[in-house]
Amino acid sequence: MLKSRNLIQPEDFSIEEIDEILELAQKIIDNPSKYSRICEGKLLATLFYEPSTRTRLSFESAMNRLGGRVVGFSEPNSSSASKGETLGDTMRIVSGYVDIIAMRHPQSGAASEAARYTEVPFINAGDGKNQHPTQTLTDLLTIKSLKGTLESHTIGLCGDLKYGRTVHSLVKAMARYKNTKFVFIAPEELKMPDYIKEAIKGHAYYETNNLDDVIGSLDVLYMTRVQQERFEDKSEYERLKNYYILNKAKLEKASKDMLVMHPLPRVNEIDIDVDSDDRAVYFKQAKYGMYVRMALIIKLLGINED
């Protein structure tokens, strides 16, 4: 049983609780039929105020594969938000209909605000440029499954580190594991925010704008797209969107067992010629997301998985 009934940010769970979720996700991967009816009679609401493919569909697939059902909306114009209904009122109403809620919202901090009004477990499926904790759990499962441990890795994060909520959540989560080192690879305009660097005090980190110089030292390279939707000045986005492009030639400088990860969607930052490389695990990573969300739903609903 998890101590918190909500997941707003990775720190809501202890390392032991995260390990429990990852272990359950692995059990589901190994024997999915065992869990195919465990959420029968349960209802998940997916409330997506912002476009999503992987996160929304993986939540819906997760609940369906557990034997539960899903209701919700995929964009705000199909909800009463378009009529001016407050987030709090929406949460009060929806939590009276369902057993668990997953919400994505473009505003940073919206998840913690929404959770105040729910009477059922609540999952942050991404809030603005703030946090994306279920992606973080997915990333942790990917690293643990393929590297065998979450300790003693050098993690390179490349691209939009200013607006990328996935990297903010991942850095804070990985900083809880021993001997983790970080390399932040970004242009000056998209550097990792100071509040994230402050949160990982005590861990070694290095900042650079040159991927070629550091790729050979990495255990994991986490590529990100430049977040077009966060830019007010579109010319600035156009100038920065292709700042980093990972291709086969660049990969020749990397170690043979480095993992190339990406939260997806990608734009141009990973060339398709990388897809066939054994180190490219981003499609496997996306599939792991469904299993992590299956495990999280089971845990937050307090269902005995045995």
Curated annotation (Swiss-Prot):
Keywords tagged on the record: Pyrimidine biosynthesis, Transferase
Protein name (Swiss-Prot/TrEMBL): Aspartate carbamoyltransferase catalytic subunit
One Pfam family cited in the UniProt record for this chain: OTCace_N
Gene coding for it: pyrB
Organism ancestry: Bacteria, Bacillati, Bacillota, Clostridia, Peptostreptococcales
Record EC number: 2.1.3.2
Stated role: Catalyzes the condensation of carbamoyl phosphate and aspartate to form carbamoyl aspartate and inorganic phosphate, the committed step in the de novo pyrimidine nucleotide biosynthesis pathway.
Catalytically driven reaction(s): carbamoyl phosphate + L-aspartate = N-carbamoyl-L-aspartate + phosphate + H(+)
MF-aspect GO terms: amino acid binding; aspartate carbamoyltransferase activity
Positions that bind carbamoyl phosphate: R54, T55, R104, H132, Q135, L264, P265
Database matches in PANTHER family: ASPARTATE CARBAMOYLTRANSFERASE, ORNITHINE CARBAMOYLTRANSFERASE, MITOCHONDRIAL
GO biological process, one term: 'de novo' pyrimidine nucleobase biosynthetic process
Source species of the chain: Clostridioides difficile (strain 630) (Peptoclostridium difficile)
Record-stated family: Belongs to the aspartate/ornithine carbamoyltransferase superfamily. ATCase family.
Biochemical pathway: Pyrimidine metabolism; UMP biosynthesis via de novo pathway; (S)-dihydroorotate from bicarbonate: step 2/3
Subunit note: Heterododecamer (2C3:3R2) of six catalytic PyrB chains organized as two trimers (C3), and six regulatory PyrI chains organized as three dimers (R2).
Binding site for L-aspartate: K83, R165, R225
Enzyme class of the recorded protein, top EC level: transferase
InterPro entries: Asp/Orn_carbamoyltranf_P-bd, Asp/Orn_carbamoylTrfase, Asp/Orn_carbamoylTrfase_sf, Asp_carbamoyltransf, Asp_carbamoyltransf_Asp/Orn-bd
